[in-house]
Amino acid sequence: MRTNFLSYLFSILCLLSCIKEKQTGADLAIGDPIPDFSVTMNDGTVVTGEELRQGVSCIMFFTTACSDCRQTLPHVQSFYDDFSGKGVTFALISREEGLESIQTYWTEQNFTMPYSAQTDRRIYELFAQTRVPRIYICKNGLIRAVFTDNPNPTYEDLVQVLCVEPHLEGVVFTLMQ
């Protein structure tokens, strides 16, 4: 009985130490600048923080094992379909997930969005400490909106951040706020 109690107590103490583990990484919010970074996308293009600071950008961190990410990714695909050719630059970046599992999931879902498979948290921690999905809508280098899993953003939520104005040479985006 005493051995069971000690095992139970040890387990509880281990769990508590995990809960109090110091979180690392930034905690970027609305108004913060996009950090410097560089990632190679699955299509071979390189996306940098410098590039994303020019105009409007959508940065998403995800893992395909995350149910909230799986719920959000189809909305982001629709957002990508409608706005990638109209001045919005996209960077979908995995958090601790390799190329093979993402590639399999993308194929199953018929996603066409380019992504960067990152097997560590190095890029993620420039932006956040916890939680995926995490979506940043930015304009001219500043974060203008942040979406997480509470609640999961919809296509309408993402589009609502943008105010689309017709222009002679295409579509000009002006972020609300």
Give names to the regions the model predicted.
Residues 137-177:
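Thiol-/selenol-based redox modules, centered on thioredoxin-like
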Residues 38-57:
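A short beta-strand-turn-helix
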Residues 87-99, 111-120:
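Thiol-based oxidoreductase modules, predominantly thioredoxin-like and allied folds used
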Residues 106-140:
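Short, internal strand/loop/helix patches
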Residues 1-16:
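Sec-dependent bacterial lipoprotein signal peptides
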Residues 61-77:
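Conserved redox-active cysteine motifs that mediate thiol-disulfide chemistry
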Residues 55-57, 62-66, 131:
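Short pre-active-site segment immediately N-terminal to redox-active cysteine/selenocysteine motifs
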Residues 18-36, 177:
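N-proximal helix/coil linker or "cap" segments that precede and/or mark the start of modular domains
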